[in-house]
A protein has these predicted regions:
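Active-site-adjacent structural elements that line small-molecule/cofactor binding pockets in enzymes
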Residues: 1-205
Length: 205
């Protein structure tokens, strides 16, 4: 909530490139699902099918409060689940879509603007809580992991695969590594210590 808006940045990147894939970090709940379905499908069309969504339910209460979002952790994931149901229903429909859920309700949503990709824009997802794993099992095309010790990554993948299998799904997996670069090795290690402290502070919240 304190950085440039992701969809606008993604539109600029897509317009300035021809082959680069665009992974848009997208938080459900800010924009109504039918409007979001049209906006994202439009961006996928204009980028010639280069868009993917990193769906972020939100893990920092202070950050979410800046945008007026006060749902607690598990309720955010319940909303995300419903939001993704709605998006996928609109993107894959052959006619107007009605939806009556706990968080979203609409009638006659038009699927006229479709994503370039079929059956829909790829959905990336992450999160280690039970609530996050449940949503990932139902919706994630690719489940994202941080670079952690091998045993932890293996255990996480097994957990997600088991949950997805129960839903008849088999997602892909990605692992992200973020190198710390500085002018000197000493400066890089100093920066690494600062990052570690930030991570510890965030986990303690």
């Amino acid at each position: 909530s304190n950085a440039a808006e992701g969809a606008v940045v993604s539109s600029f990147v897509a317009a300035a490139t021809r082959r680069l894939g665009v992974l848009l970090a997208y938080r459900p709940g800010v924009i109504a699902a039918p409007l979001a379905a049209r906006q994202l499908a439009t961006l996928d069309q204009f980028s010639e099918g280069r868009l993917a969504l990193n769906v972020v339910s939100g893990g920092n209460d202070e950050d979410l409060a800046r945008d007026g979002d006060y749902l607690d952790h598990d309720r955010r994931y319940a909303r995300t689940d419903e939001y993704l149901q709605a998006l996928r229903a609109i993107w894959t429909a052959t006619g107007p879509v009605d939806f009556d859920g706990e968080f979203y309700r609409f009638q006659g949503a038009s699927p006229a603007v479709r994503p370039r990709q079929s059956p829909h824009i790829p959905i990336y997802f992450s999160g280690s809580s039970d609530a996050a794993i449940e949503v990932a099992a139902r919706h994630a095309d690719t489940y994202m992991l941080w670079g952690e010790p091998l045993a932890a990554v293996d255990g996480h993948i097994r957990r997600v695969r088991a949950a997805a299998k129960a839903q008849g799904r088999d997602p892909r997996f990605s692992v992200s590594f973020r190198p710390i670069v500085a002018d000197t090795e000493e400066a890089a290690w100093k920066r690494a210590a600062e990052v570690l402290e930030q991570v510890r502070e965030n986990r303690a919240r």
